[in-house]
C-alpha cells in the first residue's frame, strides 16, 4: 500500500527513509560550489545578533535579497542578449534581419518587465522587514517578563516575607500589561503586513507572467513569418515582404501591454518615518506607446538610437532599426513603435536605497551595512 500524499511543506523537513542511510560522499573528489559556500556562511550569520523570535524571518529576508539580485542580473543580461541578437541579424538576409530586429525588441521589453518586477519585489521585502522588526521588538519584553518571574520565585523560595516581593510584583503587573500591548501589536501588524506582502508578491508574479506570455505570443507570430523551406543550390529565396506585418505585431503588443489590468488590488505604497512614500532601487515608469519619430531622418543608419533631447530622469531607449528596408523606407516614420523605459542612470543618487541597506544588518547589531549594488541599466549596441 502506497504512502499517503502530503499537502504541507512542514513534513518535508525530515529526510525521507531512502536518504537516511546513504553512503557517505567521497572524500577524494570534492567540487567547491562558491555560491553554496557563500550561503553556508551568510545565512547562519543572520541569527548571531538577531533575537530568537525574529531569526527565521530574518533568514527569509536575507534569502529574498539574494533572489532579488538574481532578478537584477537576469534583467540586465536579457537586455544585452536582445541587443546582440538584433546586432547579429543586421548583416543577414532581409527576412532574418527584420525578424531578429523585432524579436530583439520583444526580448528587450521582457528585460524591462523583469526590472519593473524588481521594484515591486523590493516592496514585498519591505513588508516582511516590518514583521521582522516588530518580532524583534517584542522579544525583549518577553525576556524581561520571564526574568522577573524567575526572580520572584527565587525570592519567595528563600524568604516568603521579603519586602522586595511587593515591589517586584508591582513591576510584574506593569510588565504583563506592556507584554499584552506588544503581543496585540505583533498579531495585528503581522497579519496586515503578511497579507500586503504576498498580495504584492503574487500580483507581481501574475503581472510579469501574463505580460511575458503576451510578448511571447507575438514573438511566435513574428517567427512564423520566416520561411525555412529548403532550397537547392542556385535557387533564389522568395522576396520577403513581412515588414508591415511585423511592425503591426509590435504595435499590437504595445497596445495589449498598456491595456492589461491586474486583477489584484494594489496595496497603498509604504511610507517611511517621515510619512513619505518608500523609494526603491529601481524607479521605473513603464510607458508603452506609439510616438512620432523626427530625429532619425538625417541620422546615419544604425541599429538602435537614443532619442535626442534633454534627459530628465533617465535614458529613453528606442529599439527601432533605421537600417535598410526598415521604417524609414516604408513610409511609416511618423508612427514608429517604441518602448520607453524610464531608468535611473548610474550617476544619479537615490536618497532611500532599499536594496542592501539596513534590512540585512542583523537586528540590534552595530555592524557595517553591506555595499550597495551598482545600477544595472544596459546600454544599446550601435551598429
From Swiss-Prot:
Q: Does the keyword Phosphoprotein apply?
A: yes
On this chain, the residues bearing Phosphoserine are: 162
Q: Name one GO molecular function term.
A: lipid binding
Low complexity bias locations: 311-324
Q: Does the keyword Phosphoprotein apply?
A: yes
Top-level taxonomic group: Eukaryota
Q: List every stretch annotated Disordered.
A: 292-336, 356-383
Q: What InterPro entries is this protein classified in?
A: AH/BAR_dom_sf (IPR027267), PIL1/LSP1 (IPR028245)
Identify the Pfam families for this entry.
Answer: Pil1
UniProt GO cellular component terms: eisosome filament; plasma membrane
Q: Which UniProt keywords apply?
A: Phosphoprotein
Q: Name one GO biological process term.
A: endocytosis
Entry function: Negative regulator of cell wall integrity (CWI) in unstressed cells, probably by inhibiting protein kinase ksg1/ppk21 activity and regulating their downstream CWI pathways pck2-MAP kinase pathway and protein kinase gad8 pathway. Activity may be regulated by the transient increase of sphingolipid long chain bases (LCBs) during heat stress.
Task: Please identify the protein, giving its name as recorded.
Answer: Probable sphingolipid long chain base-responsive protein pil2
Recorded source organism is Schizosaccharomyces pombe (strain 972 / ATCC 24843)
The root-end lineage is: Eukaryota, Fungi, Dikarya, Ascomycota, Taphrinomycotina
Q: What gene is it encoded by?
A: pil2
Amino acid at each position: 500500500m502506497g504512502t499517503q500524499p502530503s499537502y504541507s511543506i512542514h513534513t518535508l523537513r525530515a529526510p525521507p527513509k531512502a536518504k537516511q542511510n546513504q553512503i557517505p560522499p567521497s572524500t577524494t573528489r570534492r567540487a567547491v560550489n562558491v555560491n553554496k559556500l557563500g550561503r553556508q556562511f551568510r545565512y547562519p550569520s543572520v541569527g548571531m545578533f538577531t533575537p530568537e523570535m525574529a531569526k527565521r524571518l530574518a533568514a527569509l529576508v536575507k534569502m529574498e535579497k539574494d533572489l532579488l539580485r538574481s532578478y537584477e542580473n537576469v534583467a540586465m543580461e536579457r537586455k544585452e542578449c536582445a541587443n546582440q541578437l538584433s546586432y547579429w541579424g543586421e548583416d543577414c538576409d532581409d527576412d532574418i534581419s527584420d525578424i531578429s530586429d523585432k524579436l530583439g525588441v520583444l526580448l528587450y521589453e521582457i528585460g524591462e518587465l523583469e526590472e519593473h518586477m524588481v521594484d515591486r519585489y523590493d516592496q514585498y521585502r519591505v513588508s516582511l522587514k516590518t514583521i521582522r522588526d516588530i518580532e524583534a521588538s517584542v522579544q525583549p519584553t518577553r525576556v524581561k517578563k520571564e526574568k522577573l518571574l524567575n526572580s520572584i520565585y527565587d525570592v519567595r523560595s528563600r524568604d516568603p516575607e521579603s519586602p522586595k516581593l511587593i515591589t517586584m510584583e508591582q513591576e510584574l503587573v506593569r510588565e504583563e500589561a506592556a507584554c499584552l500591548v506588544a503581543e496585540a501589536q505583533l498579531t495585528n501588524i503581522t497579519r496586515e503586513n503578511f497579507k500586503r506582502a504576498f498580495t504584492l508578491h503574487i500580483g507581481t508574479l501574475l503581472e510579469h507572467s501574463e505580460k511575458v506570455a503576451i510578448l511571447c505570443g507575438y514573438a511566435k507570430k513574428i517567427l512564423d513569418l520566416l520561411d525555412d523551406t529548403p532550397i537547392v543550390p542556385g535557387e533564389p529565396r522568395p522576396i520577403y515582404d513581412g515588414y508591415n506585418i511585423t511592425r503591426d505585431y509590435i504595435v499590437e503588443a504595445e497596445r495589449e501591454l498598456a491595456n492589461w489590468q491586474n486583477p489584484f488590488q494594489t496595496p497603498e505604497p509604504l511610507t517611511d518615518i517621515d510619512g513619505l512614500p518608500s523609494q526603491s532601487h529601481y524607479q521605473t515608469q513603464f510607458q508603452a506607446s506609439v510616438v512620432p519619430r523626427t530625429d532619425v531622418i538625417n541620422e546615419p543608419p544604425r541599429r538602435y538610437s537614443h532619442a535626442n533631447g534633454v534627459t530628465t530622469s533617465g535614458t529613453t531607449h528606442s529599439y527601432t532599426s533605421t537600417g535598410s528596408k526598415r521604417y524609414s523606407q516604408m513610409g511609416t516614420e511618423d508612427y514608429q513603435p517604441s518602448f520607453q523605459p524610464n531608468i535611473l542612470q548610474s550617476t544619479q543618487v537615490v536618497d532611500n536605497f532599499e536594496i542592501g541597506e539596513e534590512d540585512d544588518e542583523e537586528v540590534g547589531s552595530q555592524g557595517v551595512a553591506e555595499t550597495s549594488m551598482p545600477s544595472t541599466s544596459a546600454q544599446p549596441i550601435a551598429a
